[in-house]
C-alpha cells in the first residue's frame, strides 16, 4: 500500500510523526488533501485542523495555528507556530487535549467563522476516536 510520511513540528519539537494514507490540511486558500505521489509544493497554512487518515483507516487530528507545509511525493512536513495532537489513552486525557486544542485555536483566531469551523472539526475528530 502506498503511504505518505507526515511530520508536524513546532518550535517546541515534534508533535506527530507517522505514515498515513491521506492528509487534509487547512491551506490559506482552503483545505486540500495530499495523497502519496502528490506533486511537490510549499504552501501557507491557516488556523485549523490537520485530518490524518492512518494506514489502518482510523483518523487522527492535530489542531494548528498558522505555519507552512512542504510536500514531496512521499513526505509532508508541517512547520507551525503551535499545535495540539487531539489524542489520549483515557476520556480525561482526550478531554484535556480537546480543551488545549480549543485554547490554541481561540488564541490565534481573529474571525468567528474560522473559529467556529476549527472548533467543529476538533469536536468531530474527538467523537471519531
Swiss-Prot record:
SUPFAM superfamilies: Epsilon subunit of F1F0-ATP synthase N-terminal domain (SSF51344). Keywords: ATP synthesis, Cell inner membrane, Cell membrane, CF(1), Hydrogen ion transport, Ion transport, Membrane, Transport. It comes from the Bacteria. It holds the Pfam family ATP-synt_DE_N. It is a peripheral membrane protein. Gene3D superfamilies: F0F1 ATP synthase delta/epsilon subunit, N-terminal. Produces ATP from ADP in the presence of a proton gradient across the membrane. F-type ATPases have 2 components, CF(1) - the catalytic core - and CF(0) - the membrane proton channel. CF(1) has five subunits: alpha(3), beta(3), gamma(1), delta(1), epsilon(1). CF(0) has three main subunits: a, b and c. GO terms for cellular component: plasma membrane; proton-transporting ATP synthase complex. Belongs to the ATPase epsilon chain family. This is ATP synthase epsilon chain. CDD domains: F1-ATPase_delta. GO terms for molecular function: ATP binding; proton-transporting ATP synthase activity, rotational mechanism. It is found in: Cell inner membrane. Coiled coil: none annotated.
Amino acid at each position: 500500500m502506498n503511504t505518505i510520511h507526515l511530520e508536524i513540528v513546532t518550535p517546541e519539537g515534534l508533535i506527530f510523526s507517522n505514515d498515513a494514507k491521506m492528509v487534509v490540511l487547512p491551506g490559506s486558500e482552503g483545505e486540500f488533501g495530499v495523497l502519496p505521489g502528490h506533486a511537490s509544493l510549499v504552501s501557507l497554512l491557516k488556523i485549523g485542523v490537520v485530518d490524518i487518515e492512518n494506514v489502518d483507516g482510523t483518523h487522527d487530528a492535530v489542531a494548528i495555528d498558522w505555519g507552512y507545509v512542504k510536500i514531496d511525493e512521499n513526505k509532508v512536513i508541517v512547520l507551525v507556530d503551535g499545535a495540539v495532537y487531539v489524542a489520549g489513552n483515557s476520556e480525561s486525557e482526550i478531554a484535556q487535549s480537546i480543551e488545549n486544542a480549543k485554547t490554541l485555536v481561540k488564541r490565534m483566531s481573529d474571525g468567528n467563522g474560522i473559529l467556529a469551523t476549527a472548533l467543529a472539526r476538533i469536536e468531530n475528530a474527538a467523537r471519531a476516536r
